[in-house]
Amino acid sequence: MIDIHYWPTPNGKKVTIALEELDLEYKIVACNIGRGDQFSDEFLEISPNNRMPAIVDHDPLGGGDPISIFESGAIMLYLAEKTGRFFADTTRGKYDVLQWLMFQMGGVGPFFGQANHFNR
């Protein structure tokens, strides 16, 4: 089971979409950023940069103790690797996925966030 510390933001939503598409069991743990939940000591143990989403996988890839992962891109890469889906086995295929992920995270995503923020 995967706990996703979540609030309905674009980054939170893209991880829940990945969890659904990968058919993984998960439980939403609300992280109300309007109330400041992301600054709690408990949350900072999972996501030291106080940003969500973050996950705790209680049945991690490779076994062992639960693993915490923060940052939406890192989470999606982990989930893809864990399930063997959406991430190629070849160098060319991996970097085809990575370049588009970085494009979304570094370019498109921030601009969409600004468009929404300044239209309130």
Task: Describe every region a protein language model picked out.
Residues 1-120:
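GST-like domain detector, emphasizing the conserved glutathione-binding G-site
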